[in-house]
Amino acid sequence: MSWNQYPGGGHHQQGGYGYRPPPPQWAQQGPPPPPNMGYRPPPPPQAYYNNPPPPQQYQRPAPQQNGYQQGGYQQQQQSQGNYRTSNGGYVPPTGAPVEASYHHTGAGYTPPSGTPQRTSAPYGAGAPIRPPSQAQHYGPQLQGQGGQSAQPYFQYSQCTGKKKALCIGINYVGSSSALAGCINDAHNVQKFLIERYGYKSEDIVMLTDDARNPRQIPTRANILAAMHWLVQGAQPNDSLFFHYSGHGGQTPDLDGDEDDGYDEVIYPLDFKTAGHIVDDDMHNIMVRPLPAGCRLTAIYDSCHSGTALDLPYIYSTEGVIKEPNLLAEAGQGLLSAGMSYLRGDTGGMLQGIMGIGKKVMNQNSGAMEKARQTKTSPADVISWSGCKDSQTSADTQEAGRATGAMSYAFIAALTKYPQQSYVQLLNTIRDELKGKYDQKPQLSASHPMDTNILFIC
């Protein structure tokens, strides 16, 4: 595996939409909730985190600009390890690297074979069409300052620009909650992106806990730095890809945007000392800075990952917004408010908020309202997650190799049916898992979308 270029650099805010800084209460309130918090190695399918990880004795750092630390980033033009850093690169965190206790044994399971490829999936008629290139306006016209009217919008990416990917696989070798298939998942997704979608190896950053380069170890600091790299310099029609396979869990929600009262988290290799990474932070880093028309595709193969990227539009297998998780009326009204915030139009923002019906405002104690106000985006962000927020995700064996069930199902579904719409792909992924696992993969988006158009990345 190569990591020839890691521009790194700080996170650049490109116009917030309803952005609000995270609350100051960053101290963790004990370990994550107890149910279903881990999984053990195969052969029988197991769930991520059947047992909770040890209590984390740490205090979350005080929030800095945009809710993440920017320490460690320095301007440089020199070689470090086996890759180059460009102007705006970062220096890896100080301290001894995590010791790997094993050697990498190959790219993991063999991708599905023997099944003839078809033009389209069995769900729906005919091949889906590509997404439209023009901006997609929807919802009511809003009156802004100066008497100008505006309408909320988003823009699909054509995925014809720069392609970058970040693949993270953490097996937690030597720990009481060790996994078997996550490193395989990261390498298989990397291979799939190169062969199927034309990504270049030099534009894919790999973080796995068998890496020998300390900057490729999936510590909390390295994961956050790589997330910043992924979105730095993003432009319309770029295609960015984020894949995470490892432990996931939940922690009490501190800012009131979760209707179940819990934020979703992922666990870096050094979570016992450095802490987990919360969905709010992942959204702030990887979604908020993206311009309209830039694609980010995320895959979370972990427990409790249904809304791990905090995208407010969750879709059913029929291709419609789920109820009561997201009401279209609330989504439209609060996206309007967010777009007014983006334009600096506080009057339009308030008008958009007030336009939401009382029935919607009273549901879920305001959590849905806050999420839609602050988490909608004109960028083209899609997340595929291995299960609902309340479910666990399996670490198992497929084709004789250890793997995460979601990572395998995603590759298998697109190998069998390369030309699929979003709703077709959601159904074929679920078909891959049906009868073997209880988990139900989820599709969520940063904007209301037509799920019958072609999935591209």
Swiss-Prot record:
One of its GO terms (molecular function) is cysteine-type endopeptidase activity. GO terms for cellular component: cytoplasm. It comes from the Eukaryota. Residues 57-83 have a biased composition (Low complexity). One of its GO terms (biological process) is apoptotic process. InterPro entries: Caspase-like_dom_sf, Metacaspase, Pept_C14_caspase. The keyword Hydrolase applies. Residues 1-149 are annotated as: Disordered. The active site is at H247, C303. Its EC number is 3.4.22.-. Keywords: Apoptosis, Hydrolase, Protease, Thiol protease, Zymogen. Residues 20-56 have a biased composition (Pro residues). It holds the Pfam family Peptidase_C14. The keyword Membrane does not apply. Signal peptide: none annotated. Residues 7-18 have a biased composition (Gly residues). Belongs to the peptidase C14B family. Involved in cell death (apoptosis). PANTHER family: METACASPASE-1, METACASPASE-4. This is Metacaspase-1.
